Amino acid sequence: MAQQYQPGQRWISDSEAELGLGTILAQDGRLLTVLYPATGDTRQYSLRNAPLTRVRFSPGDQITHFEGWKLTVREVEDIDGLMVYHGLDGQNQPRTLPETQLSNFIQFRLASDRLFAGQIDPLSWFSLRYNTLQHTSKQMQSALWGLGGCRAQPIAHQLHIAREVADRSAPRVLLADEVGLGKTIEAGLVIHRQLLSGRASRVLILVPENLQHQWLVEMRRRFNLQVALFDAERFIESDASNPFEDAQLALVALEWLVDDEKAQDALFAAGWDLMVVDEAHHLVWHEDQVSAEYGLVEQLAQVIPGVLLLTATPEQLGQDSHFARLRLLDPNRFHDLAAFRAESEHYRPVAEAVQELLDEGRLSPKAHATILGFLGAEGEALLAAVSDGDTQASARLIRELLDRHGTGRVLFRNTRAAIQGFPERQLHPYPLATPEQYRNLPAGEHAELYPEVAFQAQGEVADDERWWRFDPRVDWLIDTLKMLKRTKVLVICAHAETAMDLEDALRVRSGIPASVFHEGMSILERDRAAAYFADEEFGAQVLICSEIGSEGRNFQFAHHLVMFDLPAHPDLLEQRIGRLDRIGQKHTIQLHIPYLQDSPQERLFQWYHEGLNAFLNTCPTGNALQHQFGPRLLPLLEGGDHKAWDTLVADARSERERLEAELHTGRDRLLELNSGGAGEGQALVEAILEQDDQFALPIYMETLFDAFGIDSEDHSENALILKPSEKMLDASFPLGDDEGVTITYDRGQALSREDMQFLTWEHPMVQGGMDLVLSGSMGNTAVALIKNKALKPGTVLLELLFVSEVVAPRSLQLGRYLPPAALRCLLDANGNDLASRVAFETLNDQLESVPRASANKFVQAQRDVLAKRISGGEEKILPAHNERVAEAQRRLTAEADEELARLVALQAVNPSVRDSEIDALRKRREDGLAMLEKAALRLEAIRVLVAG
């Protein structure tokens, strides 16, 4: 018979028990809407298979009114599908409690209900449930939660920034690291940690259109975040009243958004917790006028609590542009450009004094006076200790100065000069004769820098006349690859057509195995191409990438880069080199540059090498120089006056050297120290590497796969193939692919093989599998035979697992203070608790399975005795529960009070600490304590043990 639903009825979710009691709001066609008042969540379910259990209490049960008073049920009445409970309250007075007024925090003894209903699970499932509780508890309390699961080498400055920013309530910061230091990874880590902690649940990412794919790949590959990419086509085709409301993470191109007012209205109406804006330095602002893009981001920043701006370094931008970014974050704090300039000058002598302390290990009288003037009387004792050579005092002094830094809490900027671990670069130019076929091509951009594209565009040619038959760069490439033999080589060219033609050329003319990679391929096809290139034993020697196709991909296991042509902008040149030139690259980068002599290619090579020095070093001034000299550069690229060309290159070189000298003298070491984490990030790196070396996850996942009927077989070293078996328990297990997937637990393997899933405690497959165990009833009952000579045959032991459970919004992060670790009780016939004397694993090794029919028969025969013991077990464990809750309250209070005191003290000396941040922390503390006060003891699982 179909289930009858009525508004006001109380139900509990089988898959999300932590939501508390649900109330039926409406039944509309085939959809059922349920409100969970405890957390404020609303869910919609299909009527046919809603994962809900009706809440019904029986005479003898004790229930709670939402105002807190309790009722012992005597009689249950059904009035038009709604339950009305009659009974006695705490003063033994008769009262009535309609189910609509039940407390939203009531817990259920589902384990005992299942045991007595004969629903007894396999013995291994009980162990799986226990271990899942323990692992969940450990991860919830881990300082690495949200940081260790990224598919990247753990890098100190990135981890420091991610933890510092993500642990704030509604962070509003500027990430302005130099190129190659991983701003996108930093932003991804912040997003990931904020989502896992519940501090954010809806994230908007605004990027330039040409970076959409790069962000999509990075978020999916590195963080397993399923981002919805929005453009005009998707927005128009959506049937939803507001397409943005369906996406937890939305990736939107700013160019489209500015031109579409309807999309803007929908975006504002959707509501977001965190906004990330990439390339924020392209948002144009002047005191008397702002661009449409800047205005739109400014409006969004006024209504979205958290804002992350990713931008070029302040030195590249200039002070006015830098002020414009800070103004987006906190318009009250940064409201006056002149005042900002004056404040910046005020901090410069302090930064120089810190530089002196770091370089010399002591302070000159001038530096001493500067810092004393900045800190005031409270700095005297600290400065005296520094003068006496106290290194700890030096560290404390730097921390005091960091806290007072004008933009230290809102701006993070790391430089290559401050970060170790980058490889050297070596340049190998190869001038080649220009073939006759290229000398009379029609004028245009392609003819100048990419003659092969212009040649192909003239029309169809015979196979033996294709451009790669006569272009000397192709002969050179084949010879170079043969010389390098099995060495991995990355080839990048500007256009997809060139990449595909080069693959043909290598196959036809040399037989060298090559993989191709361009924007016309799907993400899956690119994954396969990258995996074929990465395979050391059977893979391709060379990967040929187009400019756009290679965005967002890093191949740092290779160190030879061939630029078959040169890009038109120095930023793109740096992006190409950045595919290999990353922190963690173990070899010197070998840059191979073939170019055609007496052509625009030769002059562009000279411009980049002699003018910008962009091959051997990163070029933070490249964009400014290209903009400044562009009007002279473009006409001269085509040829003409050699003297004018030499003058241009010399002028660019002089201007570059001047700008670089300015950058060096303007380095703010105080800000670099704060951004780098002053050692804190390195501790996180070591903790993550230590966690990587542990075997707890592979051991646990093997038991999880076994329980759910997932077959695993060896793929290669450190890799497994997972496939659903015929006995797969639950089709909703998050395998990721019905056909099967390849996984690895090894970070190094995952970095070189992007076609493999990198399993960590944070991976959706791991988290989803654990949720399936704990959100349902799997393993919450078991009956076993215990083989122990010390026990008389027939002796019955009862093992009970309890959990201290608090129903609260995830954003409060109460799991950190009251995690779902099992409170274990092992009762003998006399009611004695033996758990402290017999460890779980010790007991587990002595157990044997019992056929379900026999187990059920025994349970039914002992029902009254077992029910009494279960009740007694709850009484025994209650003091431990109360102490655990009290300890959680103490920890939350101590942690929140310490952070509050720090922020209040900080605000007195640094106006970048917002009132809203302090108020939010106070509210979180009060809400958290109130929710912990309602924490209940829940019976999680029962195991009946019979001595044999």
From Swiss-Prot:
ATP binds at D177, E178, V179, G180, L181, G182, K183, T184. A motif (DEAH box) lies at residues 278-281. Its EC number is 3.6.4.-. Keywords: Activator, ATP-binding, DNA-binding, Helicase, Hydrolase, Nucleotide-binding, Transcription, Transcription regulation. InterPro entries: Helicase_ATP-bd (IPR014001), Helicase_C-like (IPR001650), Helicase_RapA (IPR023949), P-loop_NTPase (IPR027417), RapA_C (IPR022737), SNF2-like_sf (IPR038718), SNF2/RAD54-like_C (IPR049730), SNF2_N (IPR000330). Residues 164-332 form the Helicase ATP-binding domain. Residues 473-627 form the Helicase C-terminal domain. Transmembrane segments: none annotated. GO terms for molecular function: ATP binding; DNA binding; helicase activity; hydrolase activity, acting on acid anhydrides. Signal peptide: none annotated. It is an enzyme of class 3 (hydrolase). It comes from the Bacteria. One of its GO terms (biological process) is regulation of DNA-templated transcription. Pfam families: Helicase_C, RapA_C, SNF2-rel_dom, Tudor_1_RapA, Tudor_RapA. Coiled coil: none annotated. Transcription regulator that activates transcription by stimulating RNA polymerase (RNAP) recycling in case of stress conditions such as supercoiled DNA or high salt concentrations. Probably acts by releasing the RNAP, when it is trapped or immobilized on tightly supercoiled DNA. Does not activate transcription on linear DNA. Probably not involved in DNA repair. PANTHER family: DNA ANNEALING HELICASE AND ENDONUCLEASE ZRANB3 FAMILY MEMBER (PTHR45766), SWI_SNF-RELATED MATRIX-ASSOCIATED ACTIN-DEPENDENT REGULATOR OF CHROMATIN SUBFAMILY A-LIKE PROTEIN 1 (PTHR45766:SF6). Belongs to the SNF2/RAD54 helicase family. RapA subfamily. Interacts with the RNAP. Has a higher affinity for the core RNAP than for the holoenzyme. Its ATPase activity is stimulated by binding to RNAP. This is RNA polymerase-associated protein RapA.
